[in-house]
Amino acid sequence: MKLQLPRTKFCGFTRVGDIQAALELGVEAIGLNFYPKSKRYIEPKRARSMLDELAKVTGLHNAKPQFIGVFVDYSPEQVLEVLRSCPLDAIQLHGEESTQWVAAAEALPNWPGVPILRALPYRGQQDDALIQSWGALVASETSSVYGLLIDAYDPVHKGGTGKQVAWELLDPLPDCFRFDGGDVLGEAQVSVPFLLAGGLTPENVSRWMKIVRPTGVDVASGIESEPGIKDVEKMKRFIDAYRSCASD
């Protein structure tokens, strides 16, 4: 059975206290950015230290969060090297990786079978084939790809830009997001499990949740006072807004 896609993923943490605050709010997944050009970049050694420190914390509302490493154009071997020093629950591919990247990774003799979340843009029909090819991996029982993350397109920066997706393109959900879910979910036609990202804030998350109805949401800049520094009040307002919509 594949890992369940989180309903809430907060990304780009650089401080243990911020992660603890997010987990106390019940956030289901924490993103750690291993892209050296990102303002939220942390070295794998620092990430391991943070995870070790968090493991000592007790009494958190969310007992089993997913810790997801964000990688941009790493080779499978480079990702494997990070995984050896920094245990992660899943990895997020946020660069130009093709579906062949997954095949190459899964062919490595020491590949741990870590679940893969694929971040992709959606700008309309020009991205239909890309969504379909990765959606097919999500639908496959034998693939480690367990979901998609739909983010804003930026030819230079990879995530965390605050740019908004053209979310209106996802209402109604395009056919490329649908697949035969018989093998995985026991249903004839289902939508690809995906997280909505790109410019979400406490002020707009409820609106776009109601319109797009994704599996979950991902946010970085919308809960920060500056890149990598989370604002606890913004995190709380974001979670409150999400929950008010999710319970409707």
Where in this protein do the model-derived segments appear?
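N-terminal amphipathic alpha-helix/helix-capping segment at the start of soluble metabolic enzymes
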Residues: 1-10, 182
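Glycine-rich adenosine-cofactor-binding loop
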Residues: 10-12, 196-201
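Well-formed, non-transmembrane alpha-helical positions, independent of function
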Residues: 21-24, 81-85, 104, 207-211, ...
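Glycine-rich phosphate-binding active-site loops on the catalytic face of alpha/beta enzymes
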Residues: 27-39, 92-98, 153-157, 212-235
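Conserved anion-binding
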Residues: 34-39, 51-196, 204
